UniProtKB/Swiss-Prot annotation:
Protein name: L-asparaginase
PANTHER family referenced in this protein's UniProt entry, alphabetically: 60 KDA LYSOPHOSPHOLIPASE, L-ASPARAGINASE
Active site per UniProt: T11, T85, D86, K156, Y274
Main function: Catalyzes the hydrolysis of L-asparagine into L-aspartate and ammonia. Also displays D-asparaginase activity, which is about 50% of the L-asparaginase activity. Does not exhibit glutaminase activity.
Keyword Magnesium carried by entry: no
GO biological process: amino acid metabolic process
Enzyme class: hydrolase
Organism whose genome encodes this protein: Thermococcus kodakarensis (strain ATCC BAA-918 / JCM 12380 / KOD1)
Activity control note: Chohan et al. found that divalent metal ions and EDTA do not have any significant effect on enzyme activity, indicating that activity is independent of metal ions. In another study, Hong et al. showed that activity is enhanced by Mg(2+), significantly inhibited by Co(2+) and Ni(2+), and moderately inhibited by Ca(2+), Cu(2+) and EDTA. Unfolding studies suggest that urea cannot induce complete unfolding and inactivation of the enzyme even at a concentration 8 M. However, in the presence of 4 M guanidine hydrochloride, the enzyme structure is unfolded with complete loss of enzyme activity.
pH-activity relationship: Is active at a wide pH range. Optimum pH is 9.5. Optimum pH is 8.0.
Family classification: Belongs to the asparaginase 1 family.
Length: 328
C-alpha cells in the first residue's frame, strides 16, 4: 500500500508572520508535526506542488493539481491533497469534472487551525483523509472532522468553526472512527478508463441578486464574461418590476449561458415553482438544480472549455457528471 500526499499550502501549512498566518510548511513538515509515520499503515510519500493561501488559488492551479493527481494514478493506491479551506470546495468540484473515472481514492483535506498551533484540527483531519485513502473507494472526496464527503457536494459553511464543511443536498459518504471506515452512502463509481480533461474557461462570473441591483451593472458584467451564474432568491426567479433585470438576462441568454443557483444552502432551484421562475426559464436561464454554488461555477467553466453552443452547454449543466446534481 503506497499513498501520496500532495501539498498545496493553506492554513494547515501556515506559520505565523508579522502579517498574520502564511502558508510556509511542506507536506513533509505537516506529516511530521501531525505525528504520522511514513510507514503508518502504508508507505507515505510527499510532494509539494503549490504553497499558497487558498484565497490565491486560480483555475490554472486546479489544472496543475489535477495533472499531478492524474500522473500519480499508476504509482499510488491513494492520494491526499492538503489544501486551504477557503477555496477547497471549488478545487474539489473542479477536480471532479476534470478527472473522470479516478481509479483510486483522491481525498482533499485541510484545517481551520494551523498545524503549528495547540489543539489544531490538522492531525485529526489528515489522519481521516489518510485512512480513507487507504481503505476507501475510488473517487474525489473531502475529509473534515471525521466525515468523508463527495467532492462536488461540499460547501464551507463556517468561517472559523472546526466543523466548517457540510455535504449539501447529499448524504455524507462515510465516517472515519480510528482506523475504521464506516460507509454511509456509496456513490456511483465509473468503470471506464481514467481521463484527464482539463479544458476550462475561467471567464465566468458569479453574481448574487440583491434588491436594488442595477440592470446596467448586470449588463456591463455580462458583456465582459463568457458565462454567468446568478445566485437568486429561494427556489429561483429574476426581478422584472422596477429595476428590470429579466430584460438584461433575456438579452444575455441569447448569446451566452446564464445559470441560476440559489442563495439558500439547501433545497436547490426549481424555476417551475413560481411565476418569476417560469419567466426566467422562458428567458433562457439554465437551472442549476440542487448543485452547490461551487459545483455550478466550476461546471460552467468546464462546459465552456468544451463548447460555446448554448444547447450543448445546457445539456452538460443538466447532466450528472460527478454526482453533483440529483435526478439527472
Amino acid at each position: 500500500m503506497k499513498l501520496l500526499v500532495l501539498g498545496t499550502g493553506g492554513t494547515i501549512a501556515s506559520a505565523k508572520t508579522e502579517m498574520g498566518y502564511k502558508a510556509a510548511l511542506s507536506a513533509d513538515d505537516i506529516l511530521q508535526l501531525a505525528g504520522i509515520r511514513r510507514e503508518d499503515g502504508a508507505k507515505i510519500e510527499t510532494r509539494d506542488i503549490l504553497n499558497l493561501d487558498s484565497t490565491l488559488i486560480q483555475p490554472e492551479d486546479w489544472v496543475t493539481i489535477g495533472r499531478a493527481v492524474f500522473e500519480a494514478f499508476d504509482e499510488y493506491d491513494g492520494i491526499v491533497i492538503t489544501h486551504g479551506t477557503d477555496t477547497l470546495a471549488y478545487t474539489s468540484s473542479a477536480l471532479s469534472f476534470m478527472i473522470r473515472n479516478p481509479p483510486i481514492p483522491v481525498v482533499l483535506t485541510g484545517s481551520m487551525l494551523p498545524i503549528t498551533e495547540p489543539n489544531s484540527d490538522a492531525p485529526r483531519n489528515l489522519r481521516t483523509a489518510l485512512t480513507f485513502a487507504r481503505k476507501g473507494f475510488p473517487g474525489i472526496y473531502v475529509a473534515f472532522m471525521d466525515k468523508i464527503m463527495l467532492g462536488t457536494r461540499v460547501s464551507k459553511v463556517h468561517s472559523l468553526g472546526l466543523n466548517a464543511f457540510q455535504s449539501i443536498n447529499y448524504p455524507d459518504i462515510a465516517y472515519v472512527k480510528g482506523d475504521e471506515v464506516l460507509v454511509r452512502h456509496k456513490p456511483r463509481i465509473g468503470n471506464g478508463e481514467p481521463l484527464f480533461d482539463p479544458e476550462l474557461d475561467p471567464n465566468v462570473v458569479h453574481i448574487r441578486l440583491t434588491p436594488g441591483l442595477s440592470p446596467e451593472v448586470l449588463r456591463a458584467v455580462a458583456r465582459a464574461t463568457d458565462g454567468i451564474v446568478l445566485e437568486g432568491y429561494g427556489a429561483g426567479g429574476i426581478p422584472y418590476r422596477g429595476r428590470n433585470l429579466l430584460e438584461v438576462v433575456s438579452e444575455t441568454a441569447r448569446e451566452k449561458p446564464v445559470v441560476m443557483t440559489t442563495q439558500a444552502l439547501y433545497g436547490g432551484v426549481d424555476l417551475t415553482r413560481y411565476e418569476v421562475g417560469r419567466r426566467a426559464l422562458e428567458a433562457g436561464v439554465i437551472p442549476a438544480g440542487d448543485m452547490t454554488k461551487e459545483a455550478t461555477l466550476t461546471k460552467l467553466m468546464w462546459a465552456l472549455g468544451h463548447t460555446r453552443d448554448l444547447e450543448e452547454i445546457r445539456k452538460i449543466m443538466e447532466r450528472n457528471i460527478a454526482g453533483e446534481i440529483t435526478g439527472s
